[in-house]
Amino acid sequence: MAAEGDSPARPRVYFDISIGGKSVGRITMELYADLVPKTADNFRSLCTGEKGIGKSGKPLHYKGSVFHRVIKQFMIQGGDFTAGDGTGGESIYGNKFDDEAFPIKHEKPFLLSMANAGPNTNGSQFFITTVPTPHLDGKHVVFGEVLNGKSVVRQIENLTTQSGDRPAKEALIVDCGELTGDAALAADVKQPDALGDPYEDFPEDCTDTLDAVAVLKIAKASKDYGNTAFKSGNYSLGLDKYQKGLRYINEEPELEDQPQSIKDELEALRFSLNNNSALLNIKLEAWDDAARSASAALEVGGVKDADRAKAFYRRGLANIHLKDEEAAVRDLTEANKLAPNDSAITRELNGVKTKAAARAAKEKAAYKKFFT
């Protein structure tokens, strides 16, 4: 064991990441400086920014650059700090440098590998694998791996993308650098989050067997952690926990040999996690997401009328803010049928009906004026 203050044999570096302007955590990485020293030092130096200004006139530094290309079940790509779109970048050795060696195969997720435009065209762009990618062996130089922050990588991987596989929300390297001393030694130790949640955020990264009982346990814990965050006023964290629970349930564990009670609990959790997500999306004014979450809740069968009323009500609220009065009236009418004594539902239903009637009258008057 290394003495206090020592550093690991291999360099360890970090990225602090934000998505859509919201801090989502840190990715810590270890570099294979013993196997591909030139490639590893290029990445390390670009993390620290120690080489100053490059030939492009831009700092040789990943800080402030983005992950510009994301392909689910493949990889996330970044490192273009000059153009930001995959057409730029620059190594510390000049524009490009040769492939150093291929000692490591792309045989697991969370490997760091150099992006290129063909043989011997390495610059600053890199990618992090999210699955094994053996078809890249011998073509791209693997030079490190992710130690911690795998959930951050998964969050980037799961972003909605637009043209050119670019994330719709900006995935930004807010800060980066090299870890030394105790910080480097602790870089591979998974730390429970602020709520004490010990489980991986994404089921594909869980090393334990995910049978129905395990999925139920983690999903229930995720709901509890979400409720704790909600009660403390941390709506974003609460939503993250509810969505985490759903990711585990959506693994669809084998249920054939399980008692009916397990199946019923999983379905009840599927409803409550979606319905709670709808509520927190409303708190966060994420109206599209609120409507989607409420719709997912309403797809679950065997739910009590009072709970279905909440889901219809929440989708109705979302539709009001999405300016879809017709859909809002439908949802709130259904909610009112299921919970006729709920004053909040009645109030919102009457309000949206009044708005719809006023708008219709205004349009009718405008048409009448147009044709007279």
UniProtKB/Swiss-Prot annotation:
A GO molecular-function term, please?
peptidyl-prolyl cis-trans isomerase activity
Cell inner membrane as UniProt keyword: no
For this record, the Gene Ontology CC terms, alphabetical, are:
cytoplasm; intracellular membrane-bounded organelle
EC class (word): isomerase
Catalytic reaction equation(s): [protein]-peptidylproline (omega=180) = [protein]-peptidylproline (omega=0)
SMART domains for this protein: TPR
Among InterPro entries, the record links this protein to:
Cyclophilin-like_dom_sf, Cyclophilin-type_PPIase_CS, Cyclophilin-type_PPIase_dom, TPR-like_helical_dom_sf, TPR_rpt
Q: Does the keyword Isomerase apply?
A: yes
EC assignment: the record states 5.2.1.8
Q: Note the coiled coil stretches, chain numbering.
A: none
Q: Which UniProt keywords apply?
A: Cytoplasm, Isomerase, Repeat, Rotamase, TPR repeat
Question: Where, subcellularly, is it found?
Answer: Cytoplasm
Biological process according to GO: protein folding
The main place the protein resides is: cytoplasm
The family database entries (Pfam families) matched by this protein are listed as:
Pro_isomerase
PPIase cyclophilin-type domain sequence ranges = 14-178
**TPR repeat spans:** 219-252, 271-304, 309-342
Question: What biological function has been recorded for the protein in this entry?
Answer: PPIases accelerate the folding of proteins. It catalyzes the cis-trans isomerization of proline imidic peptide bonds in oligopeptides.
Similarity-based family: Belongs to the cyclophilin-type PPIase family. PPIase D subfamily.
Q: What is this protein called?
A: Peptidyl-prolyl cis-trans isomerase D
Q: Provide the species name.
A: Gibberella zeae (strain ATCC MYA-4620 / CBS 123657 / FGSC 9075 / NRRL 31084 / PH-1) (Wheat head blight fungus)
